[in-house]
């Protein structure tokens, strides 16, 4: 006859399964998630969207400091709203998508900042250049899923985005804001 053990053993086993389930990576709903780049071109605001990206998020609301995130963006997928410009930004002077097909962010820390806000730090790598970054992010639950939103300002020239004649910041501003809204659940 097989026994399940004492009630305390059974409870401990069930709790450990529940804890593992909470700590499992969330499944990103890519159809409802967005990553965009906002910048100014000739002082006119532009918002372009990355059409292909992956986000792996291990998030535990009870222990946010144990959370991790990794994001990979297909640099050739930037859609600025015009096919010719989309091809242009994939070229060597901009993202050089042939040599650097992915931009990545890997978190090194996620800290609670109160009121549904987190401070996220990590390494951002674009076009062979990496730097440590930190930015605020909000997290809320909506329809049983986690919604992560934030904005990360960067300087495009620090990553060699816009080489040669495109270094001129009077045409395309140096400041770019990477905005994201990622929806994920179990």
Regions from the PLM with identified roles:
Residues 1-6:
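N-terminal secretory signal peptides that target proteins for export/translocation
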Residues 21-186:
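Low-complexity, acidic/polar, glycine-enriched regions of mature
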Residues 7-18:
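Bacterial N-terminal signal peptides
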């Amino acid at each position: 006859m097989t026994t399940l053990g004492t009630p305390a053993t059974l409870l401990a086993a069930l709790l450990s399964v529940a804890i593992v389930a909470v700590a499992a990576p969330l499944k990103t709903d890519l159809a409802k998630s967005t990553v965009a780049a906002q910048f100014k071109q000739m002082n006119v605001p532009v918002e372009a969207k990355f059409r292909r990206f992956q986000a792996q998020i291990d998030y535990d609301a009870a222990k946010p400091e144990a959370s991790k995130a990794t994001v990979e963006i297909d640099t050739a997928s930037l859609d600025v709203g015009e096919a010719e410009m989309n091809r242009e930004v994939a070229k060597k002077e901009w993202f050089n998508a042939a040599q650097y097909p992915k931009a990545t962010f890997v978190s090194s820390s996620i800290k609670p900042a109160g009121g549904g806000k987190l401070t996220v730090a990590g390494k951002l790598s674009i076009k062979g250049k990496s730097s440590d970054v930190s930015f605020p992010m909000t997290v809320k639950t909506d329809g049983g899923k986690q919604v992560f939103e934030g904005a990360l300002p960067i300087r495009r020239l620090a990553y060699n985005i816009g080489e040669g004649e495109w270094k001129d910041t009077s045409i395309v501003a140096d400041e770019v804001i990477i905005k994201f809204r990622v929806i994920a659940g179990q």
